[in-house]
Each structure stands twice: as structure tokens, then as C-alpha cells.
Amino acid sequence: MAYITKRGSSYSVRYTYQDEHGKSCDKWESFPTKEEAVKRQKQIEHELATGNFLIPSTVTVAEFLMDWLPKQCSKHKWAPKTYQSNLALIQNLIIPYIGEMQMQKLRPYHIEALYDTLSKTPCGQYVGGKRRDLSPKQQKRTLSGTTLHEVHQLLHNSFLLAVEWGILIKSPVPVEAPKKTTQERSIWEVDEMRAALDSMEDSILHLAVHLTLVGALREGEVAGLTPEDIDFDAANGMGTFTVNRSMQRVQKDTLAQVDKGCILRIFPDKLEGSKTSLILKDTKTEASCRTIFMTAALREELKQWLERLKREEALDPERYRNSGMLLRLPNGLAVEPVLIRKKFLKWQDAHPEF
């Protein structure tokens, strides 16, 4: 039952409910008019009678999402990058704007307002949950529709669970998601591929791009290859290489949260006190594991590259730090995906014709 009590010029609705631990709790809600109090009284009595009563909660969006995140990571055995990406969405694109709002006070128009705000927000405005000062040039590059779609998907999935957990009666996330932005990518013709490779003087970049073009590899997959993945005798001497690992650099805090079953190796830190780790992990799915036929040109380049690795190690075997990877720096350390990206962007700047 719910009771109405007049308090000065306002009316209070008092009712008793059981919290999630089965403890009996009294709650008072104040209204300026008797009509509003009566309406709320009937609503409470109906919800209590039908078992649809929502236990009052002051939990905020930030508190809920930071509780939801590790639970989902553990349940679905997320890869480090998946956890890190979702954490970044929460810290940088959700909490700064609606993090302090109480979950039960959130309405669809709040979410729509968030999407509108984000559509005008510069990329990198927040990093690690902290606001950054951006240059005028940086402020012109706003978040893409694809990023907004990712925020929507995270809110949609997490708030459905908030309903299951009894925090919400209904999710406030709108049904319609922000539209993804699609960007057409030009695909090189065979002659363009050859011309591009011919213009690459950096041997590491040349091999990385050559492997990428032949096998449609991601940067992490290229960096994750080892000499053992190369088989020159396979396919009647044509040669193949196998893709079944990916290299990533992730936050050490992330590694503490994720299931380590997919992690094959954690590389030693280059710098003392580093907050990130370079890891080698399984590829995303079984479909991502594949064996790729070499072209004659790639086969020859790989043979020369492996000979080069032997020569570099023989120059100073005591100081050579053999990472065991196919792509290595002259000192034997692994070539990270970000280095491949930097080398490619530098080449791109020097060759705008491609």
C-alpha cells in the first residue's frame, strides 16, 4: 500500500518496498499537488501488485557502465582490444556528457541529445576520460557516424542488461541508431600495386605492404607473422604463408581485466615503467586463420628477407635481440603495427599520386 500525507503546502506519498536483498525499506516522494500525489500512489500500488515495481536507485550512468564493462568482458571473454575500445567509448564519449545522470532519470531525449552533441564533437576531445586542448585544425575533425553508431550499440546492449538487472523498467536508448558513415576506398589495379611497391625504398615497409596486398592482411596480422609461417615448398613449390596470429599494443590495465587464453605472448617492455604491453594473440575467429599462396615476386622477396635476418643476427649475436618475428628491426626487435602505419603514412605523403 501507498499512503498520502500532507506536509505543509506539498503532498508526500509514503510506501514500503523490498530491496534487492529482501530488506524492507520506506520511501517518501513529494509532489506539489494532491492530484499528482494520487496519480503516483495509484501507479505505485499497481506496480507493487503486478510485480513490476522498480526499486529506487541512484546509481549513475558512469557507475553502471563501469560495473557492466568488466562483467561483460569476463562473460564473453573479450580480446584486449575489444575491452580497450569499449572502455574508451565509455570514458571519452559517454561519461563526460551523461555520466553523472542517474540511470532511472535517463530518458530517450537525453540519449538523442548525446548523439547530437557527439556529432559536433572533435575527435580526441577526451582521452582516458580527460579533456584535451585541441588546435583549431584538430577541432575541425569531428566524430564519424560510425563512431556514434558504436556508442549507440554499446548503450543499447548495456541498458538491456540494466533492465534484466532490475535497474530500469525499459531502456531509454532509441530504437533507431545514428547512421554509419561509409567511405569509398579506391582499390589499386595490378599495375598500380607494382608501381607503388617499386617506389617503396624502406625494406620493412616494402615487405609489409607486399604481404598485405597478396593476402589482404591487417597491420596486426602482418606484424604477427613469424618465419615458421612461411613454407616455400607448399603448393608444389609455389609457397604459402599462414596467418593465425595478430600483434597488438594494449594498456597493461586492460590485460589485468581480460581473459588471457587468447594471448600467446607478452613481449618484454622496451622502457621501464611502460603503461602498455606489446602482445601476440590468436586471430579473432577460425575464419581469420588462413593459408595464402605466394606470388613469385613475394616468394623471392621473402627468401632474401630471411637471409637478411640471418646476416643481421650474425653481425653481433650477443646484442641481437631476436624477437622471433618475421618483421624485425636491425637489432632483432619486433616491428609493431603502429610502426608499419607510420612508415606507410610517411610514404603516402611523399607519393600523393597513389
Segment roles from a protein language model:
Residues 66, 105-108, 120, 169, ...:
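Phosphate-coordinating loops and pocket residues in cytosolic domains that bind phosphorylated ligands
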Residues 94, 111, 155-158, 166, ...:
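Conserved hydrophobic/aromatic pocket- or pore-lining residues that grip, position, or stack substrates
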Residues 160-169, 304-307:
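Arg/Lys-rich amphipathic alpha helix in sigma70-family domain 2
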Residues 124-132, 136-151, 164-225, 235-238, ...:
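Basic, Lys/Arg- and aromatic-enriched nucleic-acid-binding interface segment
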Residues 12-14, 177, 192, 225-311, ...:
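Conserved tyrosine-mediated DNA breakage-rejoining catalytic core shared by Y-recombinases
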Residues 57-163, 323-326, 341, 345:
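Short, Lys/Arg-enriched alpha-helical recognition elements, typified by the DNA-recognition helix
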Residues 123-124, 198, 202-205, 215, ...:
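Short, basic (Lys/Arg/His-rich) helix/loop patches that form interaction surfaces
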Residues 2-58, 77, 283-285:
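Short, surface-exposed polybasic/aromatic micro-patch for ligand or macromolecular engagement
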